[in-house]
A protein has these predicted regions:
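Bacterial N-terminal signal peptides
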Residues: 8-20
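Alpha/propeptide regions of enzymes that mature by internal proteolysis
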Residues: 24-416
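N-terminal secretory signal peptides that target proteins for export/translocation
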Residues: 1-6
Length: 416
């Protein structure tokens, strides 16, 4: 081949290699931000400043989003529609200070590693990572490697870890058998974690997810639990300042006819389908700075089920609905020294406001995952539409929801 022909060929080859490499690098999520409240959808309770799990002091969230390729599926090549979400309960500054936690499985057709030790010890160590079903193993190993490189040994001098890594299945849009999530993608999600406002929708581990047969993914919401609410009926009781409770979901569950938004059966009004049967899952994380012990956090995790049910889910046989709750209170409670220590605890009798906040924030987080999203075309040109904003607003208006479109309900005697 002549030099004249070689030069353009080499240039083209180099360009293709650069494009292929860049396509597999973490990419930013779309800049559009339209949340449920922006559409006038009413929710009970008062959200925090960011209406996100990051309203809980110390909590940080980071993403790696991987999108590349189009057309026919070629296993190992793509198309790629996946990613990683990392949640750091105490942030990077206190990575080696475990938090009290509680775990609950509503339906166990899924995986969340490390929960046997959470159940046994009551502690959650290090970041929580969310990804796709077939990347759990590499994500778990990557978390351990990252902690070894950036953390320190425990109080006994051992460097060991049982990370919490959870999954939902993105194989309708993503080359899930191609193992595109690499250790560096997990590291990027951890290292990019931050407080403040966070992205939602098709981002991080939620990139290729489908919820109620609309484009799903990552959603979040928060609630402020006022001091008066946790002080009980005795107004003279001393109580701390307000507590924060936040929820983050990776939403990949439900059939379209089930979708319910503030009592309105939205899914039945917008026909369409993706699956022949439910194949999805949902991971729900609940974080709070209220001083709760592991058994109380397990109770909190259970209440996420009620928020999920508000959106219409019945937690089908094929759905992996796994929930974990943690508290950032009681720092250093896991330290070996001193041998006896004091911790703070909220009485069980005062937990109802936290239960309410969990249900409310879970419901809103799931709807946010649907609203702050966009259509996506994935493997084999599978197309999943986002929930149409204008149609949703039209439905809410048509059914004349009182108090910004809240549904009217029958009482126990069947009267309106």
């Amino acid at each position: 081949m002549s030099d004249i022909l070689r030069s353009p060929f080499r240039l083209l080859l180099s360009l293709l290699l650069v494009l292929d490499a860049s396509a597999r690098e973490p990419i930013p999520a779309p800049t559009k931000t339209v949340r449920a409240r922006d559409l006038g959808i009413p929710f009970d309770g008062a959200p925090g400043k960011f209406n996100a799990i990051t309203d809980v002091p110390g909590v940080e969230v980071g993403y790696t989003t991987l999108i590349s390729g189009e057309g026919k599926l070629e296993v190992g090549k793509g198309p790629v529609r996946t990613g990683v979400t990392a949640i750091l309960p105490r942030g990077r500054a206190a990575m080696n200070d475990p938090v009290f936690a509680g775990y609950f499985s509503l339906n166990g057709n899924g995986e969340m590693t490390g929960t046997a030790w959470v159940e046994e010890s009551g502690f959650l160590e290090g970041p929580i990572v969310l990804t796709n079903t077939h990347s759990v193993g590499i994500a778990r190993d990557a978390v351990i490697a990252w902690r070894l490189a950036h953390g320190g040994p425990d109080a006994e001098g051992f460097a060991w870890s049982l990370p919490v890594v959870a999954e939902t299945w993105d194989g309708w849009l993503n080359d899930v058998d191609g193992f595109h999530v690499k250790p560096e993608h997990v590291a990027h999600a951890i290292e990019s974690a931050h407080s403040g406002p966070i992205e939602e929708g098709s981002v991080g581990g939620g990139t290729g997810m489908i919820c109620y047969e609309f484009k799903g993914g990552t959603g979040t919401a928060s609630r402020i639990v006022p001091a008066a609410a946790v002080a009980g009926r005795d107004s003279s009781a001393q109580s701390p300042g307000s507590y924060f409770l936040g929820v983050l979901v990776q939403a990949n569950c439900g059939r379209r006819p089930q979708l319910t938004i503030r009592g309105l059966e939205v899914g039945k009004k917008i026909p369409g389908s993706v699956y022949k049967q439910e194949t999805g899952s949902i991971i729900i994380l609940v974080g709070t700075d209220a001083p709760l012990l592991p058994h109380q956090l397990k109770r909190l995790a259970r209440r996420a089920s009620l928020g999920l049910a508000r959106t219409g889910s019945v937690s089908g046989n094929g759905s992996g609905d796994l929930f974990i709750a943690f508290s950032t209170a009681n720092a250093h409670a896991a330290d070996a020294k001193p041998p006896i220590r004091s911790i703070e605890i909220m009485p069980n009798d005062l937990m109802d406001p936290l239960f309410t906040a969990t249900v409310e924030a879970t419901e809103e987080a799931i709807i946010n995952a649907l609203i702050d999203n966009h259509d996506m075309i994935g493997r084999d040109n599978h197309n999943v539409e986002a929930l149409p904003h204008e149609r949703l607003q039209q439905l809410l208006k048509e059914y004349n929801r009182p108090r910004a479109n809240l549904p009217r309900r029958r009482d126990c005697r069947g009267k309106w």
